[in-house]
Amino acid sequence: MKIGSFEINEPVPQLDKPIVVAMLKPWIDVGRVGTLTLSKIEQSVDAKELGRLDRPGMFFDFTRYRPRIKITDGIRTFITPNSEIKYGKDDQSGQDYIFLHLREPHSMSEDYIDSIISVVEHFSVSEYYRVGGMYDTVPHSRPLLVTGTLNPQKTELVGDLISSGSPSYQGPTSIVNLVAESLEQSSIDCSSLMVH
């Protein structure tokens, strides 16, 4: 089944108001914070592949994201860089999750963003979280700094985990930030957590 530019595996699972946890390579995956966070949560909910881009070459320059060759049991496999979607359910709470392993697009960014939003809308997502890490001048002798944007209820829950105050960053950013901006306009609760 196609949703935007994503090919979704069939049979398509019935998910009840899933929460999306997204990460973005390579821009905000410093120290593999996003990759490791998603991996840990995916293991705890026994995540399975839901889909991936049908034609990743529409969005990615394969001279920048290099394809790889892998040999398993003497068989060579060609692996094309892609954006992947996984899903899982927390058995204790019954909460469904969707995990977005996104890559920074090199072309047709607007179509890429529209495809991500289409997936989120198709599955009636209740919340969208983006997690990652970014370079910063933080001394090794101090605890890591976590910044982000959370609604007031969530800010109260995390207490001193994240630095208080309004975001003040100005400068280069990712086109993928438009995902959260668009989802907020659709009244989907969006949060971001970045480790520095």
Features from the language model and the residues they span:
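Internal, conserved structured core segments that host functional sites
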Residues: Q95, L102-T155, V179
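Flexible, glycine/proline-enriched loop segments at strand-loop-helix junctions
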Residues: L24-I28, L100-S109, L161-Q170
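Catalytic cores of processing enzymes, dominated by hydrolases/peptidases
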Residues: T137-H196
